[in-house]
């Protein structure tokens, strides 16, 4: 007895849906690197297609089936050199499996291990960041498919608040004046000590479109995020390392807005070869230490617009 295709029947309420699919799907993936060892990732996938108003449901099992087929094909036949390429492969396969779809989207994100050394004692440690990719495909009336892809990373760092630091500096100056110190001595003292402030654990995120024929290195994105906060964080720190990290962050205080703007500037400088219409997303979230809320800053723009603003 053949089962009827319930998904293909008409729905009771004839309204189209923008995205239908599966989320939180994990698969082991191997990414090739030229002249370097392969990277093995365990990414989490989100895959979606749109659904016309005339159809009750998508064929849900086809979406995880697509990921399984693409991942297996990578292992056996095809070499993939980037997570964004993997996303594009899945999008194209989604259109094959879901012939009624006019839009398909894939998001993947994965932990990414980085080998680091502590800043003073040079102790080896493994640091964890996140890498991510997105591909979005559209099929026109003639059946032609166009796909845009993005790649990015998320990195944790430390930020020090400039406002609180300035308040404490003013308090210190007033107390030193009360104790009879000269302006010259006060200046020497302040130049010799680190002024306290409250800190945040900063989370920087950058996503950059990868136009056809271009490459965007994830390692470069990670470096930009790290260098855009007050300082880096490390899994392993000895005493001298800890003192160095804390002092460095307090000598480089930054608001959440400063971090976002620094990332934007560095993205424009590092990826100066990308076309004007390349999409860029920059986001900074600072987990506050003296508030219950978090601080947030974001910019979504085209590369050309950013270049014009920065006059680069």
Curated annotation (Swiss-Prot):
Keyword check for Cytoplasm: no
Enzyme Commission numbers on file: 3.5.4.39
Keyword vocabulary terms for this entry: Hydrolase, Iron, Metal-binding
Pathway terms, separated by semicolons: Cofactor biosynthesis; 5,6,7,8-tetrahydromethanopterin biosynthesis
Record flagged with keyword Iron: yes
Catalytic activity: GTP + H2O = 7,8-dihydroneopterin 2',3'-cyclic phosphate + formate + diphosphate + H(+)
Cofactor info, note text: Binds 1 Fe(2+) ion per subunit.
GO MF annotations, alphabetized: GTP cyclohydrolase I activity; GTP cyclohydrolase IV activity; iron ion binding
Marked site (May be catalytically important) residue numbers: 161
One GO BP annotation of this record: tetrahydromethanopterin biosynthetic process
One Pfam family this sequence matches: GCHY-1
Transmembrane segments: none
Record InterPro entries: GTP_cyclohydrolase_FolE2/MptA, GTP_cyclohydrolase_MptA
Cofactor(s) for this UniProt protein: Fe(2+)
Function, in words: Converts GTP to 7,8-dihydro-D-neopterin 2',3'-cyclic phosphate, the first intermediate in the biosynthesis of coenzyme methanopterin.
Protein family: Belongs to the GTP cyclohydrolase IV family.
Quaternary state and interactors: Homodimer.
This protein's name: GTP cyclohydrolase MptA
UniProt lineage: Archaea, Methanobacteriati, Methanobacteriota, Methanomada group, Methanococci
Gene for this chain: mptA
């Amino acid at each position: 007895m053949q089962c009827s295709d319930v998904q293909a029947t008409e729905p009771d309420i004839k309204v189209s849906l923008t995205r239908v699919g599966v989320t939180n799907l994990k698969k082991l993936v191997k990414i090739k690197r030229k002249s370097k060892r392969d990277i093995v990732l365990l990414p989490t996938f989100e895959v979606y297609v749109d659904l016309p108003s005339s159809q009750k449901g998508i064929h849900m099992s086809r979406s995880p089936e697509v990921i399984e087929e693409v991942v297996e094909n990578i292992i056996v036949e095809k070499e993939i050199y980037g997570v964004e390429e993997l996303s594009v492969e899945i999008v194209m396969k989604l259109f094959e499996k879901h012939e009624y779809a006019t839009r398909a989207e894939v998001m993947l994100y994965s932990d990414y291990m980085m080998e680091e050394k502590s800043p003073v004692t040079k102790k080896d440690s493994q640091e964890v960041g996140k890498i991510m990719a997105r591909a979005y495909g559209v099929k026109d009336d003639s059946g032609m498919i166009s796909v845009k892809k993005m790649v990015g990373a998320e990195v944790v760092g430390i930020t020090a608040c400039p406002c609180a630091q300035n308040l404490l500096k003013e308090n210190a100056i007033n107390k030193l004046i009360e104790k009879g110190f000269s302006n010259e001595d006060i200046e020497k003292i302040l130049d010799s000590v680190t002024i306290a402030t409250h800190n945040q654990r900063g989370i920087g995120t950058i996503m950059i479109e990868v136009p056809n024929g271009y490459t965007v290195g994830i390692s470069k994105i990670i470096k930009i995020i790290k260098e855009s906060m007050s300082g880096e964080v490390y899994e392993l720190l000895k005493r001298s390392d800890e003192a160095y990290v804390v002092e460095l962050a307090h000598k480089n205080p930054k608001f959440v807005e400063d971090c976002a703007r620094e990332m934007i500037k560095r993205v424009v400088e590092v990826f100066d070869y990308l076309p004007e219409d390349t999409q860029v997303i920059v986001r900074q979230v600072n987990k506050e230490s003296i508030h219950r809320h978090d601080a947030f800053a974001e910019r979504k723009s085209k590369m050309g617009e950013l270049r014009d603003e920065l006059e680069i």
